[in-house]
Design a protein with these regions (language model features):
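Positively charged n-region of N-terminal signal peptides that target proteins for export
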Residues: 1-4
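C-terminal motif of bacterial Sec signal peptides marking the signal peptidase cleavage site
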Residues: 14-16
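Conserved functional acidic sites
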Residues: 19-191
């Protein structure tokens, strides 16, 4: 028994000292978060947002009302799915792995519309009237409308919470014109 335990310890220690062919010690750090961490999709999870668009403000309640085979449907009819590549709705990946600044991906949402996404910041503090969080990620997406106009969407997500803020602007001739804003007012985790 003692010799088996000693042998196991030696194997573990030897593998911890393994080197790559270049001679350096190989250490792989697990990512702090994966995309699914930023979209809690359990039945009963609920959010309340202030939605501001074209000068009008309203409260928007959202709740996960159905989950089947990993596909979560919310009270607005949106469907989300977390998979090995990230979290997507029915048309696009909203967040892709790895969760690192500079991660980029494209979504073809129609024959004439391609959205370009980029994680622009990770491990950031973020806040809204619902609270303060650490480890937040900021994702920017761009969708070119024509030669001079581009819609820009910036989404801030907190781990275990979801979307904290989202702002859409119209980039026109170098100017950014605000279009809509979503701010988290209240978050209720699944029971």
């Amino acid at each position: 028994m003692k010799s088996t335990l000693l042998f196991s310890c030696v194997v573990v220690l030897a593998s911890a000292c393994a080197t790559t062919p270049g001679g350096t010690t190989k250490t792989e750090k697990a990512p702090a978060h994966v995309a699914a961490d930023y979209f809690p999709l359990k039945l009963g999870t609920a959010w309340e947002y202030e939605a501001a668009m074209l000068g009008e403000k309203r409260v928007l309640p959202v709740k996960i009302v159905k989950v089947f085979d990993g596909l979560a449907e919310d009270s607005t009819g949106a469907r989300l799915l977390a998979d090995a590549w990230g979290v997507r709705d029915e048309r696009r990946y909203l967040l892709r792995n790895p969760i690192e600044s500079g991660t980029k991906w494209n979504n073809v949402v129609s024959p004439s519309s391609v959205e370009g996404y980029e994680i622009v910041a990770v491990e950031q503090p973020c806040e809204s009237p619902a609270g303060k969080w650490e480890g937040c990620v900021i994702v920017e997406s761009k969708n070119r409308i024509d030669a001079s106009k581009t819609l820009v969407n910036e989404m801030t997500l907190a781990p275990g919470v979801g979307i904290v803020r989202m702002a859409t602007t119209l980039e026109d001739g170098g100017k950014r014109l605000p279009q809509s804003k979503l701010t988290l007012l209240k978050f209720t985790p699944a029971p």
